[in-house]
Regions:
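Preference for the N-terminal adenyl/adenosyl cofactor-binding alpha/beta module
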Residues: 1-203
Length: 203
């Protein structure tokens, strides 16, 4: 859940629509949502890390509630390109027309951002955008609500002590977030859920 009483996915309101997947197939929708949330939260921590020239590894203009306001069709125009064309692609192999700021983002080879079949990612060679623009939909308002919730917390790359007064989210808590998300899919077998979603956490 995102905040008290807020659902990760709402099939009735069409917040998430997947290509050729009936709404009744809740597991496929849940697995997609878990991957999306896991990747987004991981990226939120990247914003806290700095490069050798003291620049954020991931700029605010690509991942924030303000970024959602500035980019209509946020999932396809920004997040897909951030996940699959930037974080999953070595710098020397990236296309030229990536969103501004992508040039400072490192390549991560851990597999978290490698697109799978159920990511429904089919990039157009000319535009770089997915060919599923009209059949895979994640509402901008959902990202607004999600990011506004994340912005209430202090994300830190250092694990906090029990004496910290400020409410912080550290790598240890990130691990718990992943575990809880996986339990949404399969409460009895976290390992099975990890394999199904391709979600692995490394602190």
């Amino acid at each position: 859940k995102i905040g008290k009483g807020k659902k990760v996915t709402d099939y009735g309101l069409g917040i998430l629509q997947l290509p050729s997947v009936p709404k009744e197939n809740r597991q496929i929708y849940q697995e997609f949502a878990v991957r999306l949330i896991g990747r987004a939260v991981f990226c939120w921590f990247l914003k806290m890390k700095k490069s050798d020239v003291d620049a954020p590894l991931l700029p605010e203009n690509l991942l924030s509630s303000k970024a959602v306001k500035q980019h209509t069709g946020y999932y396809h125009n920004i997040l897909e390109r951030l996940f699959f064309q930037t974080l999953n692609t070595p710098i020397e192999q990236r296309v030229e027309n990536l969103p501004e700021g992508a040039e400072q983002i490192p390549f991560l080879n851990g597999g978290l951002f490698e697109p799978g079949i159920q990511d429904y990612y089919k990039p157009n060679k000319e535009t770089g955008l997915s060919e599923n623009l009209n059949t895979l939909k994640v509402g901008d308002q959902w990202f607004m609500s999600f990011f506004e919730e994340l912005e209430k917390y202090n994300f830190t790359i250092d694990e906090n002590s029990v004496t910290d007064i400020e409410v912080s989210v550290d790598p240890e808590m990130l691990g718990r977030i992943f575990e809880n998300l996986l339990a949404e899919i399969d409460p009895d077998s976290g390992e099975t859920a990890r394999k199904a979603t391709g979600s692995f956490y490394t602190p």
